[in-house]
Amino acid sequence: MPDGIVNLGYGAFEECSSLKSINIPQGITTIESNVFSGCSSLENINIPDNVTSIKENAFRGCMKFQEIKIPETVSSIGNWAFSSCVAIKEINWPDKVKNINDYMFDGCKQLRKVNFPKDLKSIGDSAFGE
């Protein structure tokens, strides 16, 4: 994607099942709802350090993700953001995000390691459910 892009709208790449890799431009500060939802072949994504928010369902159903590197600049992540990402094995949780919302990692059957921040406040309904 060109570096000049400053907005990825709701569902911009939703269900792009052949998409394998993407670099999010530096101008993006929010990953909107459903932007990459259902991108079942997406393996690699580079989230830039200036992203502060990941909305609900942003990566839901990205079944090839094995590891997600969430920048420390992120302060909020919506419900179901990574649900049904069945291959995720490890998550590095940013210190600024104090809540793991409802269904955040629902269906992430391979998840083995989550690095929680010291001051995590809450874990929502079925956050790690099946």
Q: Across the structure, where does each feature detected by a protein language model lie?
A:
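Structural signature of tandem-repeat unit edges
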Residues: 1-7, 17-30, 40-53, 63-76, ...
